[in-house]
Amino acid sequence: MHIFSQSPTYPVFVQNPYPVYDKIREGWVYWQDYEMPAIFSYSEIDKLFKNKLLGREAINSGEVNIPKRLQPFYDIEAHSMLELEPPRHTHLRKMVLHAFTSRRIAALGPEIENLCHRLIDNFPNDPFDILSTYATQVPVIVIARLLGVPESMTSQLLRWSNDMVMMYQARRTPELEDRAVTSAIEFSSFMATYIEERRNKPADDLISN
């Protein structure tokens, strides 16, 4: 295994990492900056994903020393489907898939198409940022509708999400960590309240199902 070093925050690498990836695409490397092995070959990655021995959680990794001020974030993250192994992951996945009935899936096509047309029709005449105006709006609105959350909440959902994923960025700072913790607490509190509302007044959405 070759030793490899490349700062993930180096501006030139951030803007265009592909020449570096091309050089290390064959075989495994030990990425010193991350202190872990890494692999970039499609064929090797494909083999790993098909290997039943590969899991999300590290085996016998011991207890992780989480700072007390970050504990609220990790208390929530610990229950994320992205962090779980079977059988908990399998159980949650079945629950989610059960909510996606053939009728609901069939209704999504025209619904998303109408949403896209609506957003496009509202494009301003002056120059604008298509990412914030369109590209981020489509998925967050669709997710809100699936959950049964009011569309007026989409900007709040997006802020919570953006703040929380900052925990996985290379340029993580104490300020970003504090924002992630605050947003995780706010999001969890909102969802707990909203789930209780849906329990008392079910609707045709993912939370009710």
PLM regions: where:
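Active-site substrate-recognition loop segments, prototypically the cytochrome P450 B′-helix/B-C loop
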Residues: 1-131, 140-158, 162-172, 177-182, ...
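Conserved cytochrome P450 catalytic core segment spanning the I/J/K helices
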Residues: 133, 184-209
